[in-house]
């Protein structure tokens, strides 16, 4: 009798669909193509999140992501319908040109349809970025999904959504409000977390606050700084999730890292430096990404937001330093000793080692020679503008 399929055979195809949708989203200039490019990775991620057979957490995560994702897609379509119906076209540059060249009041005498449509579209895109106040799904979905799917969900789709947000620009200070909420929620929400993937979910929310801040400022330099921040966030997240996957904790608890420095010293120092970089501790690369965003904010007189960003970064640094403390200075409890005794010890395979090594090398290389990253970000920002 043939054993039932676990669904793993379709995983490579679904991952490629996520990558394809994100690539198409970066190059899309029509609202219909934007919608299709957003839904292609979203539908693939619905399946990937819930594909862990026999896991109630995975099924719950998939259901939450499906329901809330469908709601966000509906809001996005409604916003597109309002703008396209108002202007008679679907091209993003043409719609912006019509609404910004003096014909907006003639087409929309009430002055209500245009801002409502823009708000609905922006809100749906903020959901895809897991930015506050549209972040409620992220911790549960990140925790319930398989680690490889969580890493994919936390990185690849956000790059394409970033490009669309840059194209439509800031809308009625919505991005500024999302920036403030994301920084505060991300910093405070992670303080009491005991699971590493939930902590990384709140960390991602806080980082999206910095990315949105650069888009809200709206200048070439600030968008370039946001793009650099997004690239470095993706690299650091890939390294962090790869190490979580390689360590293979039974419960994905943060305290499972205790004693790692004695058993796997190379992994311990890599994990510690990665989390310190995510925290923005100098002279690691995460510090420079935050510095460039802060510099843009101060240059354009966002003083209060700059102070809030510094405070939230300090608060967020507490739980990253706590992880380093657990890695180096905390002994195993009896509960953890029992868990690790029951767990079969696995060697890290070549693919995971290569992924960890490549991402960590990029983090180190960009500290020594950031010129290549700055030049690539400059060219990419020119294309976005």
Curated annotation (Swiss-Prot):
GO terms for biological process: ATP synthesis coupled electron transport. It catalyses: a ubiquinone + NADH + 5 H(+)(in) = a ubiquinol + NAD(+) + 4 H(+)(out). It is found in: Mitochondrion inner membrane. GO terms for molecular function: NADH dehydrogenase (ubiquinone) activity. Its main location: mitochondrion. The chain crosses the membrane at residues 12-32, 34-50, 66-86, 112-132, 161-181, 200-220, 227-247, 268-288, 291-311, 354-374. Its EC number is 7.1.1.2. The keyword Transmembrane helix applies. It is a multi-pass membrane protein. Keywords: Electron transport, Membrane, Mitochondrion, Mitochondrion inner membrane, NAD, Respiratory chain, Translocase, Transmembrane, Transmembrane helix, Transport, Ubiquinone. It is an enzyme of class 7 (translocase). One of its GO terms (cellular component) is mitochondrial inner membrane. Belongs to the complex I subunit 2 family. Core subunit of the mitochondrial membrane respiratory chain NADH dehydrogenase (Complex I) that is believed to belong to the minimal assembly required for catalysis. Complex I functions in the transfer of electrons from NADH to the respiratory chain. The immediate electron acceptor for the enzyme is believed to be ubiquinone. This is NADH-ubiquinone oxidoreductase chain 2. It comes from Metridium senile.
């Amino acid at each position: 009798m043939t054993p039932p399929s676990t669904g793993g055979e379709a995983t490579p195809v679904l991952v490629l669909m996520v990558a394809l949708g994100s690539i198409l989203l970066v190059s899309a200039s029509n609202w219909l193509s934007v919608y299709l490019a957003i839904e292609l990775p979203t539908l693939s991620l619905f399946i990937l999140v819930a594909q862990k057979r026999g896991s109630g957490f995975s099924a719950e995560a998939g259901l939450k992501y499906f329901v809330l994702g469908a709601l966000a897609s509906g809001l996005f379509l409604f916003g597109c319908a309002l703008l396209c119906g108002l202007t008679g076209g679907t091209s993003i540059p043409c719609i912006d040109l019509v609404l910004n060249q003096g014909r907006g009041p003639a087409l929309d005498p009430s002055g209500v349809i245009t801002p409502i449509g823009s708000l609905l579209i922006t809100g749906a895109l903020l959901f895809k970025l897991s930015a506050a106040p549209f972040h409620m799904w992220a911790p549960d979905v990140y925790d319930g999904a398989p680690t490889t799917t969580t890493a994919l969900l936390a990185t690849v789709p956000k790059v394409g959504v970033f490009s669309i947000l840059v194209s439509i620009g800031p809308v009625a200070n919505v991005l500024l409000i999302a920036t403030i909420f994301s920084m505060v929620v991300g910093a405070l929400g992670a303080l009491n977390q005991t699971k590493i993937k939930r902590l990384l979910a709140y960390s991602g929310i806080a980082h999206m606050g910095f990315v949105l801040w650069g888009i809200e400022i709206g200048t070439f330099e600030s968008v370039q700084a946001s793009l650099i921040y997004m690239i470095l966030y993706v690299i650091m997240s890939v390294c962090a999730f790869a190490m979580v996957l390689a360590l293979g904790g039974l419960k994905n608890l943060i305290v499972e890292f205790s004693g790692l420095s004695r058993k796997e010293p190379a992994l311990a120092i890599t994990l510690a430096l990665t989390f310190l970089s995510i925290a923005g501790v100098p002279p690691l690369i995460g510090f420079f990404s935050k510095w460039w965003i802060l510099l843009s904010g101060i240059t354009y007189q966002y003083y209060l937001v700059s102070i809030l960003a510094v405070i939230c970064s300090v608060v967020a640094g507490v739980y990253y330093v706590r992880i380093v403390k657990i890695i180096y200075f905390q002994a195993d409890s009896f509960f953890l000793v029992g868990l690790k005794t029951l767990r079969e010890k696995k060697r890290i395979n070549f693919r995971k080692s290569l992924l960890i090594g490549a991402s960590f090398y990029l983090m180190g290389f960009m500290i020594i020679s950031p010129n290549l990253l700055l030049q690539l970000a400059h060219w990419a920002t020119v294309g976005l503008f």
